[in-house]
Amino acid sequence: MSNILKSTKLDIALVKPYFKTICFTLLLPIVFAAINRSLLTGVSFAMCFIAMTTGYTFSITEKNSMDRLFGILPVRKSELVIGRYVFVLAMGLLSLIISLIAQPLVLKVLGETVGAFDIVTAAIAGVFLFALYTVFQIPGYYKYGSIKGRVFMYIPVAGFLVTLLLLSKMPAIGNSIISVVESSPILLVFLAVFAIVVMYAVSIFLSIQIMKNKVGNCETRDARSQT
């Protein structure tokens, strides 16, 4: 556990110069929520934006050729990978908390009514969308790097646009979902948590295997260059 936390702290140190940029990305969804007068849309937008910052650590690592450093650190590859997931999840959780505090306040100032049901629904949707984005992004970055895998940065944008399209084109489905949430909120939360846990378990497993293969290939190339 200590090595996982050390790995997380390393990622925090790597991304520290970008903290101002990350904080700025949380202001835009507040404006978006105010324009649309919707907490659900605003929180979904916030989680989309913060998911796009997932590639920062991979970009910094790649630019500074830190793959070999990770190969010689006295830390298991699985601990490095899990530490990065912890960092990403912490960023997502912090962004969600800020959004669920700031956006309802702005909406109330504008005269909108924001109840507990709206906050819970927005929180569940935000967490699920963030998980849905990052479980694909992180293995993609591990596999292709931040440059070749730049396309993975736009997964949240595509997902958010699809979400908006579905909400606008299929109001009947939206109403049925709301009725399900109102009738059995505990079941919905359980299913959402279960789906998120399964998705992250598979994603972490894939990332660990990719990381091990990449480090192994680097060690093989180094051995060949010395002979």
Placement of each model-derived feature along the sequence:
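Hydrophobic alpha-helical transmembrane segments of membrane proteins
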Residues: 1-65, 83-227
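Short helix-to-coil transition segments within interhelical loops
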Residues: 72-77
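Alpha-helix N-cap/helix-start motif at helix boundaries, enriched for small hydrophobics
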Residues: 79-81
